[in-house]
Amino acid sequence: MAYIKVENLKYRYPNTTKLALDGLDFEIEKGSFVGIIGENGAGKSTLCQAFNGLIPGFFKGAYGGKVLIEDTEVAKTTVSKLCQKVGLVFQNPFNQLSGAKETVFEEIAFGLQNFGVPKEEMISRVDEVME
């Protein structure tokens, strides 16, 4: 079973005519490491936002298709539920919603700190993700 499944995903930002995502179909298995690469404006950040519900939840553009995380449709669940399964580290740490952090480690640890995870466990979990 795929951990993340994308089915015919399309998205267009409000007040634009160009699709940011145009019919994407793929699966990511649990435990996989995946890099998303492409030119500026190719839809990399938009795709990541679709993984954790910012699209269509926060950005209200034209949305079609499905993103499923462990067979749960992202568009039909809450962002708080999705945050338990999917994290997002933005491209520029100084533009984070969480405030300016100095390192990638601090960015990854931010969510765990908010959940009250003990420091030793947090360090271990962040180290594991960074490997």
Residue ranges and their predicted role:
Residues 60-73:
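Conserved ABC transporter NBD signature motif
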Residues 109, 113, 118-131:
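Conserved ABC ATPase "signature" region
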Residues 6-9, 17-34, 65, 129:
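Conserved beta-strand
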Residues 34-36, 48:
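Short hydrophobic beta-strand immediately N-terminal to the Walker A/P-loop
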Residues 37-42:
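The feature captures the beta-strand-to-loop junction immediately N-terminal to the Walker
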Residues 52:
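Helix-to-loop junction immediately C-terminal to a conserved catalytic motif
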Residues 1-6, 10-23, 55-60, 76-78, ...:
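A short, flexible loop at the N-terminus of ABC-type nucleotide-binding domains that lies
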Residues 88, 92-93, 100-114:
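Q-loop/switch helix immediately C-terminal to the Walker
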